[in-house]
């Protein structure tokens, strides 16, 4: 929903704008003035301060940022500010839906023992940060992959708490202007690569490679630290969703994404993880400090929901090997629980146990009546995740999986282009799937041709497809050294399970809200008809643009594919966002990807790049 429509002349618009701004500032002062925390958390970018953005390349943006913020662009009857205010520097790492200050201000009554304070709590539109998030002092363009796996700029994530706290575990080490990652972890001080090989050896996988000749492709690492486990699995063609909350281990997911490793901010609390059932072949917890016995095994049952038939759970923790009374008691209770869940010990050696989930429903059906935990209700949807609470029950397999005694997935990489078994759940045919795959391959080739003057082989690493559908955009990038976070809306067909069945990863998300990631974490955003979609929901295009700017790294790219009228509206914000046009191309309405266009309106591919800028305060601090 675009803001600021104008019905009168320029003079009237200016007077009206000034009055509205004055009233709004007064409202903010009265509303937040009583709370020092609220005032410091919002400040609306220090009210309406000027950007003061000096480009590190020496470009002053043609002096446009020196103009008064209240000057409006009246073209096509839309009044749009030529510059957005900049949020206070202290908010350079704000995550709107995971903002502890917002929780305090709203006095939300959350159960800390259930980790509710680490779950999503999104501000209403009137309390959003409608300002640009500044990079921290001394920010530099991130180090390119694959070098970034082992080192990042310290200025980009100025948090050295973990380096000191975990100094004996080789998580990360300060080295001058950089932070290096030796590959260690709490349980694998001598390197994740050796630890991974040892697990593969325990499971008798060929050549001590955990991918089991392509049969093991998707992994969930809970309590992942700085994601070194997932980083070293990439060499084996294993895609890991590294998951952790933004807790006392400051910014661990931010470090992971800065390194170019797939990661997501999330927690095993009260809500289901944002993944469909049967998404992962392997789950991992290395001293993740999770009480798996709480609430009748609720958290372990959530892992069970997202594991595929025959999937593994590797658990490296004192409970698995320590001989003191407390740990022996926990081990006994945990062993009894997983036995009732029909898991079996695949192997137990040294400090690690690996359990395996059954291949079919046979064991569930053979349990004694009244055995806990029970099977979930037959009418329960195991794939519904948006705002759905976890349940302490076992998710049985579908008739297809029970009959085939497994997921029926092809090994990787054939899995990427093979028709997923769950395709029939949506009434899609194999022909539709193959055509979609080929169409997006052509489109991605076209995108890269349009960006050829700007994009080299290592320019982008972290990519997000904001409307992934069946994941064919990501599939088309298989030969590039990138990874894709595939996002599927909770309002449409839940095709995220098809994406996981292709050996890709993703999450469920509504773009009327902020995404669960730190600022400056993605190199490229692909927005296919996202703006048209949110407009139909009555949500703000301006809010989405500001959110995309928050997510996007400086020098990163946005590919917008939408109606021409929508793209023309977006163009009015480029100067305010400090984005510049890279390429623009009309799309034929006969394209099967763009058939929703009304009245024969052409769709447009519009590609922009975010400039690198710092606030004047940050520049002074870095001198």
Curated annotation (Swiss-Prot):
Q: Which UniProt keywords apply?
A: Glycoprotein, Golgi apparatus, Membrane, Methyltransferase, Signal-anchor, Transferase, Transmembrane, Transmembrane helix
Question: Under which name does UniProt file this protein?
Answer: Probable methyltransferase PMT8
Q: Which domain of life is it from?
A: Eukaryota
Keyword Repeat included in the entry's annotation: no
Q: Which cysteines link up through disulfide bonds?
A: none
Q: Name one Pfam family in it.
A: Methyltransf_29
Family affiliation: Belongs to the methyltransferase superfamily.
Q: Which InterPro entries match?
A: Put_SAM_MeTrfase, SAM-dependent_MTases_sf
Q: Which GO terms describe its molecular function?
A: methyltransferase activity
Where is this chain glycosylated? 204, 350, 588
Where in the cell is the protein located?
Answer: Golgi apparatus membrane
Spans within the Lumenal topological domain: 35-623
Root EC class? transferase
Q: Give the Gene3D superfamilies listed for this entry.
A: Vaccinia Virus protein VP39 (3.40.50.150)
Q: Specify where it is mainly localized.
A: Golgi
Q: What is its EC number?
A: 2.1.1.-
Topological domain spans for side Cytoplasmic = 1-13
> Organism source for this protein?
Arabidopsis thaliana (Mouse-ear cress)
Tell me which GO cellular component terms the UniProt record holds. endosome; Golgi apparatus; Golgi membrane; Golgi trans cisterna; plant-type vacuole; trans-Golgi network
Q: How does it sit in the membrane?
A: Single-pass type II membrane protein
Transmembrane segments in this chain: where? 14-34
Q: Which terms does the UniProt entry file under GO BP?
A: methylation
């Amino acid at each position: 929903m675009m803001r600021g429509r104008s019905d009168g002349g320029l003079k009237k618009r200016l007077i009206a704008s000034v009055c509205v701004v004055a009233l709004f500032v007064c409202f903010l002062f009265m509303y937040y003035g009583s709370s020092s925390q609220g005032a410091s958390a919002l400040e609306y970018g220090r009210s309406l301060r000027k950007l003061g953005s000096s480009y590190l390349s020496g470009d002053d943006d043609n002096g446009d940022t020196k103009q008064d913020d209240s000057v409006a662009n009246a073209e096509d009857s839309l009044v749009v500010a030529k510059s957005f205010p900049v949020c206070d520097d202290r908010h350079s790492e704000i995550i709107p839906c995971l903002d502890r200050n917002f929780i305090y201000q709203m006095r939300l009554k959350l159960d800390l023992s259930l980790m509710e304070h680490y779950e999503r709590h999104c501000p209403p539109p009137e309390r959003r940060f409608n300002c640009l998030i500044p990079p921290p002092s001394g920010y530099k363009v991130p180090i390119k992959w694959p070098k970034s796996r082992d080192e990042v700029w310290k200025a980009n994530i100025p948090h050295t708490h973990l380096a000191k706290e975990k100094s004996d575990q080789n998580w990360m080490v300060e080295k001058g202007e950089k932070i290096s990652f030796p590959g260690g972890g709490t349980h694998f001080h001598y390197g994740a690569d050796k630890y991974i090989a040892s697990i593969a050896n325990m499971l008798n996988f060929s050549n001590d490679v955990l991918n089991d000749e392509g049969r093991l492709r998707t992994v969930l690492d809970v309590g992942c630290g700085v994601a070194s486990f997932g980083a070293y699995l990439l060499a084996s063609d294993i895609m890991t969703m590294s998951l952790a909350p933004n807790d006392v281990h400051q910014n661990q997911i931010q470090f992971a994404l800065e390194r170019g490793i797939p990661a997501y901010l999330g927690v095993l609390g009260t809500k289901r993880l944002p993944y469909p059932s049967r998404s992962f072949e392997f789950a991992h917890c290395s001293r993740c400090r999770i009480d798996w016995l709480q609430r009748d095994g609720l958290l372990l049952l959530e892992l069970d929901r997202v594991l595929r038939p025959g999937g593994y759970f590797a658990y490296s923790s004192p409970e698995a090997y320590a001989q003191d009374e407390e740990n022996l008691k926990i081990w006994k209770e945990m062993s009894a629980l997983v036995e009732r869940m029909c898991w079996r010990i695949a192997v137990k050696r040294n400090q690690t146990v690996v359990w395996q989930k059954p291949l079919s429903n046979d064991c569930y059906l053979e349990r004694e009546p009244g055995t806990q935990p029970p099977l979930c209700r037959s009418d329960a949807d195991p794939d519904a995740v948006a705002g759905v609470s976890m349940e302490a029950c076992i998710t049985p397999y579908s008739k297809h999986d029970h009959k085939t005694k497994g997921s029926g997935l092809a090994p990787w990489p054939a899995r990427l282009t093979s028709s997923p078994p769950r395709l029939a759940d949506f009434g899609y045919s194999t022909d539709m799937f193959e055509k979609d795959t080929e169409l997006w391959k052509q489109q991605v080739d076209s995108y890269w041709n349009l960006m050829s003057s700007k994009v080299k082989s290592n320019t982008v690493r972290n990519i997000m497809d904001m409307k992934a559908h069946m994941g064919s955009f990501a599939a088309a990038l298989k030969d590039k050294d990138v990874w894709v976070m595939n996002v599927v809306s909770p309002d449409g067909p839940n095709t995220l399970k098809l994406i996981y069945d292709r050996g890709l990863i993703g999450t469920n998300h509504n773009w009327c809200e902020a995404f669960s990631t730190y600022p400056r974490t993605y190199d490229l955003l692909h927005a296919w008809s996202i703006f048209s979609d949110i407009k139909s929901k009555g949500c703000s295009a301006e809010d989405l643009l500001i959110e995309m700017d928050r997510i996007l790294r400086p020098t990163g790219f946005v590919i917008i594919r939408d109606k021409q009228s929508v793209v023309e509206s977006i163009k009015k914000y480029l100067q305010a966002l400090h984005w510049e046009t890279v390429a623009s191309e009309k799309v034929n309405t006969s394209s099967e990807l763009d058939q929703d266009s009304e009245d024969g309106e052409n769709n447009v591919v519009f590609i922009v790049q975010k400039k690198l800028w710092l606030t004047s305060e940050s520049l002074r601090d870095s001198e």
